């Protein structure tokens, strides 16, 4: 199943010594980042973000809520991030027409 693109992209810098800049634009990418690349996995916001991405991928919550969980985890881990409009996202109306 393909994850829906978020309306906004999260540009995230993770890591302490040599931070890596990542472009995350959907819940699947966020889950992969959290599970495979996230150095600090021992706080509540991280766990909420993992669960949020999982629930979004199952269709239980919106993908936009998963994005918010990711940003909260980044804040708690003191990782820099910026948010920009996702030029690749498709509105619900456009998706229904297609």
Pin down the residues of each PLM region.
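Short, compact, well-ordered microdomains
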Residues: 54-91
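The feature represents the first ordered module of a protein
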Residues: 1-51
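Weak global preference for isoleucine
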Residues: 14, 24, 61, 65-68, ...
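Short, functional C-terminal segments
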Residues: 1-7, 83-98
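General "foldedness" signal
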Residues: 24-26, 48, 67, 84, ...
